[in-house]
C-alpha cells in the first residue's frame, strides 16, 4: 500500500496523479487468490439468481365458499432446486392488514426432472436458448388453455401435458405429467395447444409443421417443405420456423399461429381448424460454418447466415387446414397459398415481423417491414384469400376465379420514419360487430412523435373489387384503408414500453388499458392505466423509487410486480385493485401478499450511485458509479469504464444490479472505481436519442463515454484519469476497441469481449437497420469497422486483451480472427483469450469463472 501524500490543492488532476503517493495501488493477488475471491462472491449470486417466479397465469376460483379467489400459476425455482418448474400459489380472498402474508410455492409436478439427461440439448433447443438468452434449466416456457386447464410444455427432450382447474376442479397434491409419445425423430419444437379445440396441439419437427391429438395420439404432418437431408445446402425450405435473423434481431421466436376459432362445414358436421404459417426458402442465403460443440470430432455446423447487403430468405404466408370428425379423427388436411404470389401482392416486404389472428378468426393479420426497416404495414388477410396449393395451373386459376371480388388484403395501419422502426408486439384489435366495415384497435407507435405512445385507431375496410385470376401488380398505396380516427391515449417525452415482449392489458368492460412505461422517469418502469374511451388522466399503479415488471390478472382485479431498486434486491408482490366500481380508473392498488421477499445483499455489497450530467451538446445523460470500498482522502483510484453503448439496451436504471453485474461490485471491493454510462444510442430515451447512431456506429458513443468520465472525475475526485480501463462484451467489446483506437491517451487498457470488428460480416436485420446496406454507406462501414483501423492501436504490450467464444454463431469468431490477423500484419501487440466451448454468451460456470479471474488478473497487472 502506498502511503498517503496530500497533493497541494492548486495542482491539476493530472499533476496530482503524478505524485506516486496519491495513487491507490490495488493489492496484488495470486491467480489462486483471485479465484477464491470470485468463488466467495459466486456463492452468493447462486442464492438469488433465477429464483424469482415469472410467466404468470391467474385463474379465478369460482366456488363461493372457498377461501381463495385465484390460483396463480408460474415458472420458478423452488428452494434447493437447480431447475425451473411449474408451480402455483393460492391467493386468499381475505388478508390481515398488518400481517405480511408470504404465499407458499406449491409444486404442480410430482418428482419431475425436466432437464435432459446429462443436460444435453438438441441443436435446435440449444440454439433457441441462445436466441432467447436463457440460462436456466428445467421448464422454460409452457402453453396454457384456460377453459380446459390444459398445460403443455417441453422437457427432457420430449413433450408433456397435465391438467388443473377446468372441468375436473383443482388438484391438491402434485401430479405426474403425462409424456406425449411420438413417431417423430428429433425434437418437437414450439408446441402450442389449439385454442379452438384443446384436444389438438401443434409442433415443429425437422422444419415442418405437425398436429397431433392429445387424447388419441394421432399425428399428422401438415407441411412438406423439408426433406430431412443432412446437408444444409440441399434442404433450404422450412414451414412455421422463425429464421436466425427473425429470432435474433426481431424477437419473434415462432413461425406459425393458430386461428382461435373453428368453422363447421358440410352436412357431416366436419370441423375445420386453421394455422397461419410462414414458409421460408433460404436457398439464396449464404451458408457459414461454425465449429461444432463436439470439438474433438473436428466437425463444423453449417448455418444459413445472411450477411449485410446479401440475400435474405424468400418468404410467404400460407394456411394449413385440417378437418376432423366428431370423434376427433383427422379426416383431411390441406395446404393453402395466397391467391397471388406473396411477392406480387407485397413487393416491398422483406420481413414478416409479427403475425396472428383477430379474436373472431375472421382475419389473420401480419406486420410487414421493408428492407431498410423504415416502413411498416399492418395488414389483415381474410382466410378466403388463400386457395389450395397446386402444381396444376388450371386448378389454380379455377380456385382464383372462385375467390369473391370483395375478398382482399387490408392495410389498416402504416408507420414511416427516417430513423428506423423498432418492432414490438403491441397491437390489440377489438371484436367487430356483425356486418361492420370498420376495425378498431389499439397500437403503440414510436414514429409519430419520436416517443413510443398508445393510439386508438379506427380503420375503414373498403374493398376495391379484384379479379384474382388476372395477373396483378400493386399500385403505390394498394389495399390501404382510410383511417377514420386516431386518438393519442398517451403523449409526452417518455415512452410506453413496447419492445422486448412488453404487453398491454385491455379491460373492454371498463374501457381501460393497462400498460408499462417511463412516464415518471426514464430510470424506472411503472404500471399505468388510462381510459381509451375518454383519453385523459394517466394513473400510476406501482410504487415510485423502484423499477417494476408487472403482470395483470385476467379479470383486471390484481397484478403481480417483480420490482427492485439499485439498493434493494428483487421482490415479487401481489396487489389487489380496490375502490368503487363506478370509478375503475382510480381503483387503488393494495398490497395483498408476497411471493418472494428481497434477499439480503452480500456482506460487502455497496450499491452504485446514479448520476446525470449534460454533454457539451446539451444532452442529458445518466450514469452510475461504484465507489471503491477502500476510499481514503486524497487517493486516486484506477477506474474501469464498463460499457455496452449500443441500441436496445439500457444499463443505468433504478433496478438491482447485484445479480447480473455483481462483478462490478467485486471490482469496487478490490479498490477500483467502476463507471457505467448510457450514452446516445441507448434505449428508453426516444427514437432521436437512440437514432444518434444512424449510419455511424462507433463514431459518437466514445465521445459521450469520455465526457462522462471527465464529469465523474471532477465530481468525485477519486478517479485516476491516467489509469482507466474500458471493458464490455458484444457491442461493448466493439466500443472497447473503438476507445483504444480513438482515445489511447484516455484509456490505458481495453478488454474486448466477443466484438464485432467488421460490420460487413454481421447480419442483415441488425446491421442494415442501423447502418443501411454497405453500398449506400461505405464511409460508415469503414469508419465503424475496428479491424480496418489497427494501425491506430498502441505499440505498447499489455494494453489490449480480446476474449471470444469459439462457437459463437451470432458474432462469429471470424471477427476476432480477422482482427488478430490485421494486428499481426500491422505488428501490434495483443493478448487473446479463447473459450473453445462457448457461444456468444458464456454459459459454463468454469468458463465464466475463468473469464472473471482473467479480467481481475489483467487489471491488477497492467492498469
UniProtKB/Swiss-Prot annotation:
Homodimer. Forms a ternary complex with NLRP1, composed of a DPP9 homodimer, one full-length NLRP1 protein, and one cleaved C-terminus of NLRP1 (NACHT, LRR and PYD domains-containing protein 1, C-terminus). Forms a ternary complex with CARD8, composed of a DPP9 homodimer, one full-length NLRP1 protein, and one cleaved C-terminus of CARD8 (Caspase recruitment domain-containing protein 8, C-terminus). In the ternary complex, only one subunit of the DPP9 homodimer is bound to NLRP1 or CARD8. Changing residue 730 to A: Abolished dipeptidyl peptidase activity and ability to sequester NLRP1 and inhibit pyroptosis. Changing residue 138 to S: In HATIS; likely pathogenic; decreased dipeptidyl-peptidase activity; less able to maintain NLRP1 in the inactive state. It is an enzyme of class 3 (hydrolase). It holds the Pfam family Peptidase_S9. Residues 1-20 are annotated as: Disordered. It comes from Homo sapiens. The active site is at residues 730, 808, 840. This is Dipeptidyl peptidase 9. PANTHER family: DIPEPTIDYL PEPTIDASE 9, PROTEASE FAMILY S9B,C DIPEPTIDYL-PEPTIDASE IV-RELATED.
Amino acid at each position: 500500500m502506498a502511503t498517503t501524500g496530500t497533493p497541494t490543492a492548486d495542482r491539476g488532476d493530472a499533476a496530482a496523479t503524478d505524485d506516486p503517493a496519491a495513487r491507490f495501488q490495488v493489492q496484488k493477488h495470486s491467480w489462486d487468490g483471485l479465484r477464491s475471491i470470485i468463488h466467495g462472491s459466486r456463492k452468493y449470486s447462486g442464492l438469488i439468481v433465477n429464483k424469482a417466479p415469472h410467466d404468470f397465469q391467474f385463474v379465478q376460483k369460482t366456488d363461493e365458499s372457498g377461501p381463495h379467489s385465484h390460483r396463480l400459476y408460474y415458472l420458478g425455482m423452488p428452494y434447493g432446486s437447480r431447475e425451473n418448474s411449474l408451480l402455483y400459489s393460492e391467493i386468499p380472498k381475505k388478508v390481515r392488514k398488518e400481517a405480511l402474508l408470504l404465499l407458499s410455492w406449491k409444486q404442480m409436478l410430482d418428482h419431475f426432472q425436466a432437464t435432459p439427461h446429462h443436460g444435453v440439448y438438441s441443436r435446435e433447443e440449444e440454439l433457441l436458448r441462445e436466441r432467447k438468452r436463457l440460462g436456466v434449466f428445467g421448464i422454460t416456457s409452457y402453453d396454457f388453455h384456460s377453459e380446459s386447464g390444459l398445460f403443455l410444455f417441453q422437457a427432457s427432450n420430449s413433450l408433456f401435458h397435465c391438467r388443473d382447474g377446468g372441468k375436473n376442479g383443482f388438484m391438491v397434491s402434485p401430479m405426474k405429467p403425462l409424456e406425449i409419445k411420438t413417431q417423430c425423430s428429433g425434437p418437437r419444437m414450439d408446441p402450442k395447444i389449439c385454442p379452438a379445440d384443446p384436444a389438438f396441439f401443434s409442433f415443429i419437427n425437422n422444419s415442418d409443421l405437425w398436429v397431433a391429438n392429445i387424447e388419441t395420439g394421432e399425428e399428422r404432418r401438415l407441411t412438406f417443405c423439408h426433406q430431412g437431408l443432412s446437408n444444409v445446402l440441399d434442404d433450404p425450405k422450412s414451414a412455421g420456423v422463425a429464421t436466425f435473423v427473425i429470432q435474433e434481431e426481431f424477437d419473434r421466436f415462432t413461425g406459425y399461429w393458430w386461428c382461435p376459432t373453428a368453422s363447421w362445414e358440410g352436412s357431416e358436421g366436419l370441423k375445420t381448424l386453421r394455422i397461419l404459417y410462414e414458409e421460408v426458402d433460404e436457398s439464396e442465403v449464404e451458408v457459414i460454418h461454425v465449429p461444432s460443440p463436439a470439438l474433438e470430432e473436428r466437425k463444423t455446423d453449417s448455418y444459413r447466415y445472411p450477411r449485410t447487403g446479401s440475400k435474405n430468405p424468400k418468404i410467404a404466408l400460407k394456411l394449413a387446414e385440417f378437418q376432423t370428425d366428431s370423434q376427433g379423427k383427422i379426416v383431411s388436411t390441406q395446404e393453402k397459398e395466397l391467391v397471388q404470389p406473396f411477392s406480387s401482392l407485397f413487393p416491398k416486404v422483406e420481413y414478416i415481423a409479427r403475425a396472428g389472428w383477430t379474436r373472431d378468426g375472421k382475419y389473420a393479420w401480419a406486420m410487414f417491414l421493408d428492407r431498410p426497416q423504415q416502413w411498416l404495414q399492418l395488414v389483415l388477410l381474410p382466410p378466403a384469400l388463400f386457395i389450395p396449393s397446386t402444381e396444376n395451373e388450371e386448378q389454380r386459376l379455377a380456385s382464383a376465379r372462385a375467390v369473391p371480388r370483395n375478398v382482399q388484403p387490408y392495410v389498416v395501419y402504416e408507420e414511416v420514419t427516417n430513423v428506423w422502426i423498432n418492432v414490438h408486439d403491441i397491437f390489440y384489435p377489438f371484436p367487430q360487430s356483425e356486418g361492420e366495415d370498420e376495425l378498431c384497435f389499439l397500437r403503440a407507435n414510436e414514429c409519430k412523435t419520436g416517443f413510443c405512445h398508445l393510439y386508438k385507431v379506427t380503420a375503414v375496410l373498403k374493398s376495391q373489387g379484384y379479379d384474382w385470376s388476372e395477373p396483378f401488380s400493386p399500385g403505390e398505396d394498394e389495399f390501404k384503408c382510410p383511417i377514420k380516427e386516431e386518438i393519442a391515449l398517451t403523449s409526452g417525452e417518455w415512452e410506453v414500453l413496447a419492445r422486448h415482449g412488453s404487453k398491454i392489458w385491455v379491460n373492454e368492460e371498463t374501457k381501460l388499458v393497462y400498460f408499462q412505461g417511463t412516464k415518471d422517469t426514464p430510470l424506472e418502469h411503472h404500471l399505468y392505466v388510462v381510459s381509451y374511451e375518454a383519453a385523459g388522466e394517466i394513473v400510476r399503479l406501482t410504487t415510485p423509487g423502484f423499477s417494476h415488471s408487472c403482470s395483470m390478472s385476467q379479470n383486471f382485479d390484481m397484478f403481480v410486480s417483480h420490482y427492485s431498486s439499485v439498493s434493494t434486491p428483487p421482490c415479487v408482490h401481489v396487489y389487489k385493485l380496490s375502490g368503487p366500481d363506478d370509478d375503475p380508473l382510480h381503483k387503488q392498488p393494495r398490497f395483498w401478499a408476497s411471493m418472494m421477499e428481497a434477499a439480503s445483499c452480500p456482506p460487502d455489497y455497496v450499491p452504485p450511485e446514479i448520476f446525470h450530467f449534460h454533454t457539451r451538446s446539451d444532452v442529458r445523460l445518466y450514469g452510475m458509479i461504484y465507489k471503491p470500498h477502500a476510499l481514503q482522502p486524497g487517493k486516486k483510484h484506477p477506474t474501469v469504464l464498463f460499457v455496452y453503448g449500443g441500441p436496445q439496451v439500457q444499463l443505468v436504471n433504478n433496478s438491482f444490479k447485484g445479480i447480473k453485474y455483481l462483478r462490478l461490485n467485486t471490482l469496487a471491493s478490490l479498490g477500483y472505481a467502476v463507471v457505467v454510462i448510457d450514452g446516445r444510442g441507448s434505449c428508453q430515451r426516444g427514437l432521436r436519442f437512440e437514432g444518434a447512431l444512424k449510419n455511424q456506429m462507433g463514431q459518437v458513443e466514445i465521445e459521450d463515454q469520455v465526457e462522462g468520465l471527465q464529469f465523474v472525475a471532477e465530481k468525485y475526485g477519486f478517479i485516476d484519469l491516467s489509469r482507466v480501463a474500458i471493458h464490455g462484451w458484444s457491442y461493448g467489446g466493439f466500443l472497447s476497441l473503438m476507445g483504444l483506437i480513438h482515445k489511447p491517451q484516455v484509456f490505458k487498457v481495453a478488454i474486448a469481449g466477443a466484438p464485432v470488428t467488421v460490420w460487413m460480416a454481421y447480419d442483415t436485420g441488425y446491421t442494415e437497420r442501423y447502418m443501411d446496406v454497405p453500398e449506400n454507406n461505405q464511409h460508415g462501414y469503414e469508419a465503424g469497422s475496428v479491424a480496418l483501423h489497427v494501425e491506430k492501436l498502441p505499440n505498447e504490450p499489455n494494453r489490449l486483451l480480446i476474449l471470444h467464444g469459439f462457437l459463437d454463431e451470432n458474432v462469429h469468431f471470424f471477427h476476432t480472427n480477422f482482427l488478430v490477423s490485421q494486428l499481426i500484419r500491422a505488428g501490434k501487440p495483443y493478448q487473446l483469450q479463447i473459450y473453445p466451448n462457448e457461444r456468444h454468451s458464456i454459459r459454463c460456470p468454469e468458463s465464466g469463472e475463468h473469464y472473471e479471474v482473467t479480467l481481475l488478473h489483467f487489471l491488477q497487472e497492467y492498469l
